[in-house]
Amino acid sequence: MARILQTLYGLPSRSAQELADAINSYQTNVEDYPDEEFGLLSCRLAYQAVQLGNFGIGCVLVDSSGDIVGQGFNELFNPYFRSDRHGEMVVMDTFEENNKSITSMADYTLYTSLESCPMCLARLITSGVGTVKYVSPDLTGGMVHLMTNLPKIWQILAARQKFPQASVPSLLVQLAFDIFKLNADELNSKIVNR
């Protein structure tokens, strides 16, 4: 099992330094790509996660006015191991803890640098976030592209929401996936060996 996980995602096409340079020099064009600003921020957060030894996934929660009301990144290994600290979970935990009187999330949008895994997708469906946009698909670990495989009740609950890929250029899609690939195989092996 550990051998399979060591090559599941493969190496990123760029080094960590090249990815940092790409993030820092990236210029947005929101006229052509309306999700690019928040998509880029989710990638910057994902890179922070990698620098701390976590999976490279970052998330931004935005209200109906386009204001950022939450942001965070994967914290699975650092500051200490917590199996529930996926990027989406971190953002939703903090938001829900600090906004207990909000009864509807229908007008909110969550941006994530990588397509949500099964656990995060179930959480986002339960939360009722109106729209969840991912920068990069994850055909190996993502669940959005497999929503028809969810149990029927989850499909019914998810029908009130949208889960599209973010409107961003392919350059940002590749950047998001390369950030994730920086340490994904290594960290998956750590999980297998727990």
Where are the language model's segments positioned?
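Short loop/turn motifs at secondary-structure junctions and domain boundaries
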Residues: 49-53
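A short, polar/charged loop-to-alpha-helix boundary motif
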Residues: 75-90
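Short beta-strand scaffold segments in enzyme catalytic cores
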Residues: 57-63
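A structural motif shared across PLP-dependent enzymes of the aminotransferase-like
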Residues: 63, 85-89, 168
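Zinc-dependent deaminase
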Residues: 1-48, 116, 122-194
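Glycine/small-residue-rich phosphate/adenosyl-binding loop
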Residues: 70-71, 87-104
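Immediate flanking context of iron-sulfur cluster ligation sites
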Residues: 104-114
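Short beta->alpha transition motifs characteristic of CBS
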Residues: 67-76
